[in-house]
Amino acid sequence: MSIHIRKMRYLPLVAALALAGCGGDDGGAGSASALSSAGAPHTSSSPAVTAPPSASNVDKSVSPVELPDTVVPVNYRLWFRPNDALNAFDGRADVEIKVLKPVNNIVIAGHRIKFTNGRITLQPGNIQLIATPQDKGDFYQLRPVAGTIAPGNYSLHMEWSGIINFKSYDDPATQTGGSCGDDPYPGCSAAEGVFRVDLKGTDGKTSGAILTQGETNLSRQWFPGWDEPAFRPTYEVTAEVPQSWRVVSNAAEKPSTNVGGGYKLVQFEKTPPMPSYLLFFGGGLFDTYEDDFTSPLPGGKGGLHLRVFTPPGMSEWAKPAMDRTKQALDYYYRYTGIPLPLTKFDTVAANDAFKEQKDLNFGGMENWGSILEFADDILPQPGQPMSHYGNEVLTHEVAHQWFGDLVTTDWWDNVWLNESFATFFETKTTIQFFPNEFSWLDQVKNKYRVINRDIGPNAFPVAPNFNDWASNDFVLSASAFTYDKGGHVLKTLENYLGEQTLRKGLQQYLVDYSFGNGTPKRLWDALSKESGQAVGPIGDSYVRQTGVPLISLDTQCDLTKNQTVVTLKQQPFPNKNAYPGLQWTVPITLAYGQGLAKRTTLALKDTQAQTRIEGCTGVIADPSGLDYYVVNYSDTAWSGLLTQVNSSTDPVLLANLKSEAALLVANNLAPASRSTSIGSVASPAAMKLRQTPTFDGIEAVTKERPARQYQGLFKPRKVVTQ
């Protein structure tokens, strides 16, 4: 899910995990520059198509966290109808379920909905169920009047009414009234469950429309059910809407039927198995721009019909978004070798009454087959290019179709498995398709922004593993780590393992856990199998604790063997963390030799290690400038490094050294001469860097991503998921 880059007030967890959704890197938008292709290597062509590996015989399921595992939903037949005022709706569902063992009740999630008395039944047997609210209305027990429910296959019928959200509050100052005024939880937003937007056409006229937002646990405001990632039923959506509306959902639309009164019945094909938060519906006076995507895979497997839904009169504005969508799909098809299990792919671009107030709190959502964006981000006026942010947010949401939708995180403390990957891939696609908008220097700047946050008092692990402290304190700032730090960790792993090794490992991960759930261990195991390296200790040490490792590097020349002895030590970088990291397994790349052209890698798992390299030479750690650790060189090592850097043509390497030195000096870990010496380098790289006024080293962080909104406190995990 994509989010707006703006300062927000801190909210307890909950605020942290629902409306952050996906999307765009908040570290300096890449500037068009001659340095766009400098630094870390990348290819200029799309990835070559490779066949994905065969699936392994693995368990792709996980245990639910909040709901019992005794009842499993198989398929939803969902119907709903908004009222004329677009402030409420009626809903009903027939859900095929499997009861796995005798139960006294069926527990489902539901929030701000009202069940219709006498309209909850179980078939066969015509068993009447009574809905009893639990946990402030977030869950219900559906109890039979007498007896228990035996194991077997059933059809659960439910009817209810719900609210269509439109305003956050009637009085924002006092947070009273309006659609959220009766909600006791913090961070209530208009974009929850079913919500209304005002489409504004090119003629200036506005019209009401409805959209849905399910992440993280907001779909329970639309329909009651099994609202967590462990459950993946299929869905068949039906709705009664005004005759003039165009509608969109995850699956392809069937022919509609006139039901009178100015309304029509619209129906959609069955979706792939997916978690409830990805289910989507949109309806209103949309225009559409259409095209087709031709799959690059053998036999054209996985071709898609594409549409962009726009406000009235803006269909021609959607051409750039259509082009970007086709580019992104082509890239991800090639990279993964896996086609989407869909027949169509839609992008819904809605402008709305909330954009000026920024109450929606996000920039996009990865609903499977129907991503949600906003018009001012991805619909430039005819003849104008799409904004950098629009490109990022669109490619971010498309990446989620694989990382998040095809394979879904097991629970929200591992949402980085969705978001870090989408952030990582939005960078890759920007390099591929928009090189004039990309600069590796901005990636260096972003890394140090994140490091500054990571050593501060409000740092959180990328994967916090919710417990008592996290449930209460996982605030908005956590999203800087869920998205950005996680993306930098993935880049560090790519630098260490190699681009193609990482790619093949990710292909195995996606194939093995398609239509299932990913976990960190499942990811690490796939990468370890492909690389032959123990990736788990590296990955867990980075995502499960805060802070950044400080690497001390010393060199000594062994003249008798013509070798350089490199001594490496690690400790936590000085920080203000409440729960600081202590030790990492750090994947280190060393560059050495003439022009720093030679490479060697090692994983520093102990507090100290030594390695030898051929020749008496200057050595630099992290030659890409993008690895997630800070290096403090001894005087001897620094002197040898400067000798090599003085002839360097890589401004990214120099930019990293400059930022690194500034950080060390600011924390009294290195003398001031460290900064002045790197600042006086007169290499070709330095000349390029000085011609880039946008690069000025470390910047204070003034912007935060709003994070996901959650209704209440997440249930703590008792054990770390494997």
Residue ranges and their predicted role:
Residues C22, H42, P47-T343, T347, ...:
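Acidic/His-enriched low-complexity segments
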Residues Y448, K561, V565-T567, A578-P580, ...:
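Long, ordered, helix-rich scaffold segments
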Residues S2-D26:
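Gram-negative bacterial Sec-dependent N-terminal signal peptides
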Residues D59-S61, W79, G313-E316, D410, ...:
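A ubiquitous short alpha-helical element
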Residues A29-A34, F115, F268, G300-K301, ...:
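Hydrophobic alpha-helical and helix-loop surface patches within well-folded domains
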Residues P73, Y235, E419, G487, ...:
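Non-catalytic, well-ordered alpha-helical scaffold segments
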Residues L17-T50:
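Bacterial Sec-dependent N-terminal signal peptides
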Residues D84-L86, E228, D468, S479-Y483, ...:
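Structural motif
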